[in-house]
């Protein structure tokens, strides 16, 4: 067997193995219950959310609604490459809340209530967790919430 043929076979094997590894990783889609409390306490959220907008997940009690601005959805993704599921979920969760805060301030809202997980338009309500979808390349958190102005404590 010639040296060129050996190199060609080795290259073909390596290329095929790489495609197999990448396609296997990309096909991964694990649903992870991600703790809202953990997410809210993380530096990713703590450093970016300024407190002007309050977030109420599931059916958590909130002050009286004075004005409604509508229901909005955000679907935030972040790289999962060489990052733990927990870290990529934290980042995606933080990105979703940052988007909600930005939208609320644009609308004049001071709260987002009834926040639910909304991945693939599947509405799942929880006071304690959101769904994080971790894949081989990307991790995503999709949230749906009602933007309102609330009064009082």
PLM feature spans:
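Sec/Tat signal peptide C-region and signal peptidase I cleavage site
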Residues: 20-27
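Glycan-processing catalytic domains of CAZymes
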Residues: 28-33, 42, 153
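N-terminal secretory signal peptides that target proteins for export/translocation
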Residues: 1-5
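Extracellular/periplasmic catalytic domains that process cell-envelope and extracellular macromolecules
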Residues: 63-66, 105-106, 135-138
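Compositionally biased P/S/T/G-rich terminal and signal peptide-adjacent segments
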Residues: 39-81
């Amino acid at each position: 067997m010639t040296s060129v043929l050996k190199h060609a076979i080795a290259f073909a094997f390596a290329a095929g193995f790489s495609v197999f590894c990448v396609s296997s990783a990309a096909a991964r889609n694990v649903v992870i219950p991600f703790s809202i409390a953990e997410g809210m306490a993380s530096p990713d959220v703590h450093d970016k959310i300024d407190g002007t907008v309050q977030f109420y997940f599931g059916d958590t009690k909130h002050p009286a609604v004075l004005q409604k601005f509508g229901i909005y959805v955000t679907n935030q993704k972040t790289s999962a490459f060489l990052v733990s599921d927990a870290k990529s979920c934290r980042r995606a969760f933080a990105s979703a809340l940052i988007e909600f805060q930005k939208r609320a301030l644009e609308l004049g809202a001071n709260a987002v209530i009834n926040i639910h997980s909304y991945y693939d338009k599947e509405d799942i309500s929880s006071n304690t967790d959101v769904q994080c979808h971790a894949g081989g390349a990307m991790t995503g958190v999709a949230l749906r919430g009602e933007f309102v102005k609330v009064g009082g404590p």
